[in-house]
From Swiss-Prot:
One GO process term, biological-process aspect: clathrin-dependent endocytosis of virus by host cell
Lipid-binding residues (covalent, S-palmitoyl cysteine): C555, C562, C565
Record text on subunit structure and interactions: Homotrimer of disulfide-linked HA1-HA2.
Designated name of the protein: Hemagglutinin
Membrane spanning residue stretches: 531-551
Purpose: Binds to sialic acid-containing receptors on the cell surface, bringing about the attachment of the virus particle to the cell. This attachment induces virion internalization of about two third of the virus particles through clathrin-dependent endocytosis and about one third through a clathrin- and caveolin-independent pathway. Plays a major role in the determination of host range restriction and virulence. Class I viral fusion protein. Binds to sialic acid-containing receptors on the cell surface, bringing about the attachment of the virus particle to the cell. This attachment induces virion internalization either through clathrin-dependent endocytosis or through clathrin- and caveolin-independent pathway. Plays a major role in the determination of host range restriction and virulence. Class I viral fusion protein. Responsible for penetration of the virus into the cell cytoplasm by mediating the fusion of the membrane of the endocytosed virus particle with the endosomal membrane.
Disulfide bonds: C30-C482, C68-C293, C80-C92, C113-C155, C297-C321, C489-C493
Principal localisation: virion
Organism: Influenza A virus (strain A/X-31 H3N2)
Length: 566
């Protein structure tokens, strides 16, 4: 029995002994990539969540809270609407001749003149806003037989009764109001905008006291259009002490065309025209303060940076702005797939390369080498493969911004109650566009992320194959991203492998000799398993033989009696 125990002990020592080649005659070289303890989750085409070492947020979700006055010219409407400034409301006289890129209307704006309405308010507001100017040219209209410059206590200019400065209220002269027929040709080479109106008295008595006739009529024509308006006499809700109203209309006269005005009463006549310009100017409702700063993109919430391709601050924008999307976040991968390092390994406790996990602490590159040789252990980055990956990734964000950032503005849409169907259709179209852009944005980012991860994986594989081609039969692929080098390889040798100057032939004979010696005695884990199973089987067989012999011996001595019955 003692002999068997001794042999078993010797056998176990033989199995557990250090293998030849784990001394200074071999080295280990592993290839790996950068990793971080806590990566960032991004979405790809194939995965909803995949962890990468670094990612950039693509959605701007906050504003500065203020509107920057540079590089866009911002005109603060203060307490005036654009239409009030256009008509010449007394408290808006400061805006005469003003120009702007963006006119900012405030919620506190109010009218302080004769009560009026504009049947096509949204179109007029948008037209004037895009022109970017309130430049007004007075013309010499001749109104014979009527009283001009009518005014009202509801529209005081200083202590006196007044009226809109750009309009001329015509009333009867003595007891007559003749038929007016005035023409005004456009001999210039630009469009002219004429603002005019019609007065709706609250009573028949007011109608005749102002215009003599029981009902007036206003017709304004050009070669391209004609509008005939008849006043609607009747009481309306009281505003600033008045129950009568004025309706404002507008006509554009092209170069070479003629403006014709015909009326027998109730006419609010133009005093001249606004010079129309084509441009990128616009208007926005906002209560954000205007500050001295620089920003290309403006929203009602305030200016926002345009260094991201998407934003979800506001659908209404002006300038070079990111596209509005519904998502609160879209992350673009700007690093590789993250596989955190298994901390229990130590540097070379159980050496492993990129196939098993990444390496934390690689601050000078994305890809690199770790080695273990007779001089110790070390690590170095591979700058060439790192730079190749970075160069291809760096342009991604700029390309996405170029695809989405355009010089455009999304203005507010306004519709009257009778245009409810148009408003519903417009809202549906806008919502559909936003849904489409949101889907496209998510798809675009997922595609770019997939490409980034595939790209960085490819660079790792290229570096591994490059190293394999250098080492050839001088080393063995260990299957985990590492090579077992079968010759003595000091730090200079390791450096030659990293920089591509390794000479395979110099070490060939030594590597073949060491490989032969090691392979001759090396027991792989598979052979150990076979030996253990064979040993177990032999032990069981010997135990059975001993037991059977003991039974036969006792039977011969008569100590055991065995009866076999059939």
């Amino acid at each position: 029995m003692k002999t068997i125990i001794a042999l078993s002990y010797i056998f176990c020592l033989a199995l557990g002994q250090d293998l030849p080649g784990n001394d200074n005659s071999t080295a280990t070289l592993c290839l790996g990539h950068h990793a971080v303890p806590n990566g960032t989750l991004v979405k790809t085409i194939t995965d909803d969540q995949i962890e990468v070492t670094n990612a950039t947020e693509l959605v701007q979700s906050s504003s500065t809270g203020k509107i920057c006055n540079n590089p866009h010219r911002i005109l603060d409407g203060i307490d005036c609407t654009l239409i009030d400034a256009l008509l010449g409301d007394p408290h808006c006289d400061v805006f005469q001749k003003e120009t702007w890129d963006l006119f900012v209307e405030r919620s506190k704006a109010f009218s302080n003149c004769y009560p009026y309405d504009v049947p096509d308010y949204a179109s007029l507001r948008s037209l004037v806003a895009s022109s970017g100017t309130l430049e007004f040219i007075t013309e010499g209209f001749t109104w014979t037989g009527v009283t001009q410059n009518g005014g009202s206590i509801a529209c005081k200019r200083g202590p006196d009764s007044g009226f809109f400065s750009r309009l001329n209220w015509l009333t009867k002269s003595e007891s007559t109001y003749p038929v007016l027929n005035v023409t005004m040709p456009n001999n210039d080479n630009f469009d002219k905008l004429y603002i005019w109106g019609i007065h709706h008295p609250s009573t028949n008595q007011e109608q005749t006291s102002l215009y003599v006739q029981a009902s007036g009529r206003v017709t304004v024509s050009t070669r391209r259009s004609q509008q005939t308006i008849i006043p609607n006499i009747g009481s309306r809700p009281w505003v600033r002490g008045l129950s009568s109203r004025i309706s404002i209309y507008w006509t554009i006269v092209k170069p070479g065309d003629v403006l014709v005005i015909n009326s027998n009463g109730n006419l609010i006549a133009p005093r001249g025209y606004f010079k129309m310009r084509t441009g990128k100017s616009s208007i926005m409702r906002s209560d954000a303060p205007i500050d001295t700063c620089i920003s290309e993109c403006i929203t009602p919430n305030g200016s926002i940076p345009n260094d991201k391709p998407f934003q979800n601050v506001n659908k209404i924008t002006y300038g070079a702005c990111p596209k509005y999307v519904k998502q609160n976040t879209l992350k673009l991968a700007t690093g590789m797939r993250n596989v955190p390092e298994k901390q229990t390994r130590g540097l070379f406790g159980a050496i492993a390369g990129f196939i098993e996990n990444g390496w934390e602490g690689m601050i000078d590159g994305w890809y690199g080498f770790r080695h273990q040789n007779s001089e110790g252990t070390g690590q170095a980055a591979d700058l060439k493969s790192t730079q190749a990956a970075i160069d291809q990734i760096n342009g991604k964000l700029n390309r996405v911004i170029e695809k989405t950032n355009e010089k455009f503005h999304q203005i507010e849409k306004e519709f009257s109650e009778v245009e409810g169907r148009i408003q519903d259709l417009e809202k549906y179209v806008e919502d559909t566009k936003i849904d489409l852009w949101s889907y496209n944005a998510e798809l675009l980012v997922a595609l770019e992320n997939q490409h980034t991860i595939d790209l960085t994986d490819s660079e790792m594989n290229k570096l591994f194959e490059k190293t394999r081609r250098q080492l050839r039969e001088n080393a063995e692929d260990m299957g985990n991203g590492c090579f077992k080098i079968y010759h003595k390889c000091d730090n200079a040798c390791i450096e030659s492998i990293r920089n591509g100057t390794y000479d395979h032939d110099v070490y060939r004979d030594e590597a073949l000799n060491n490989r032969f010696q090691i392979k001759g005695v090396e027991l792989k884990s598979g052979y150990k398993d076979w030996i253990l199973w064979i040993s177990f089987a032999i032990s069981c067989f010997l135990l059975c033989v001993v037991l059977l012999g003991f039974i036969m011996w006792t039977c011969q001595r008569g100590n055991i009696r065995c009866n076999i019955c059939i």
